[in-house]
Amino acid sequence: MRRRNVSFLRPPGALPESAFLKTCIHCGQCAAACPYGSVRMLETFGPERHTPEIRPSEIPCWLCMKCPPACPSGALRPVAAMKEANMGRAVIFKDRCLNWIESGTMCMTCYDRCPLRGEGMVLDMGYVPAV
């Protein structure tokens, strides 16, 4: 059976994936430390089972940085500044974005959810999101 190539968005300060999987002890303390409920433990099979993930489309990470100090194994390392969290890059799908599809529409959902708004995500022309 061939394994699917699946990637998960890990909490801030996560080691590279292979090292993360070897280091994480599946304790859930990172998820318990998250005041927003953004960090949750994966319910899957394989080595990723009971490791932390973030699903920004459901509950975004607000980069409060409470999860790294809660990690007893070192799978999550402290992050000095939000910009160093390096949790990925947002992508704007212009064919699905109301501000791009309908002129004059003022949807701010992605901008409001971005913890680095104004830096990681900006509003071009005052209302069109850009990364």
Tell me what each language-model feature is.
Residues 1-131:
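Non-ligating segments of multi-cofactor redox enzymes
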